[in-house]
UniProtKB/Swiss-Prot annotation:
Annotated function: Co-chaperone involved in the maturation of iron-sulfur cluster-containing proteins. Seems to help targeting proteins to be folded toward HscA.
Stored Pfam families: HSCB_C
Protein name: Co-chaperone protein HscB homolog
Gene3D superfamilies noted in UniProt: DnaJ domain (1.10.287.110), HscB, C-terminal domain (1.20.1280.20)
Length: 174
């Protein structure tokens, strides 16, 4: 299912999330199962299925990584359950540096400063990836779609690493 069509958006990485939320509420009102309480069982079932599609579509489009994965899936590139790893040597080196910095936080003289520095480094790198991804996803070239898939893989890794950093920060605050 094309969630962009469901929510009446052109397929694009950058979307108006406020408008997305508004359209979500409109769709929810239109397909909510309570609205079909007096209808046939088939209508009730269709309403439940449609509600699930609307919910899944909203969750997909509001999350940048899932939105990019959806855009790529519409082009025949499935990333959601893949195990392919990033082969970019520069990114792998950066990944190792971040992991080392993450491990060194507990022994740091100023753990919070180290955490803040890592958050800033993540934000800068993620902004670069997102900018590149936006450009690649607007292209119609098959090669650019494959490059976009690599950017999404990097963003997925960054999201996991960000979660790890948040856990380390929470543990230090306890």
């Amino acid at each position: 299912m094309n969630y962009f069509e469901l929510f009446k958006f052109s397929p694009a990485f950058d979307i108006d999330t406020a408008l997305l939320a508004e359209r979500y509420r409109e769709l929810q009102r239109a397909v909510h199962p309570d609205k079909f309480a007096n209808d046939t069982e088939q209508q009730k079932l269709l309403s439940v299925q449609r509600t699930a599609q609307v919910n899944d579509g909203f969750q997909t489009l509001k999350d940048p990584i899932r939105r990019a994965e959806h855009m790529l899936s519409l082009r025949g590139i499935e990333l959601s359950h893949e195990t392919t790893t990033v082969k970019d040597t520069g990114f792998l080196m950066q990944q190792m540096e971040w992991r080392e910095a993450l491990e060194d936080i507990r022994d740091s003289a100023d753990p919070q400063a180290s955490i803040d520095e890592l958050y800033q480094s993540f934000a800068q790198y993620r902004a670069q990836l997102t900018q590149q991804l936006t450009q690649l996803l607007t292209s119609e070239q098959a090669e650019d779609a494959l490059l976009a898939a690599d950017q999404v893989r990097k963003l997925k890794f960054m999201a996991k690493l960000h979660d790890e950093l948040t856990r380390v920060e929470d543990a230090l605050l306890d």
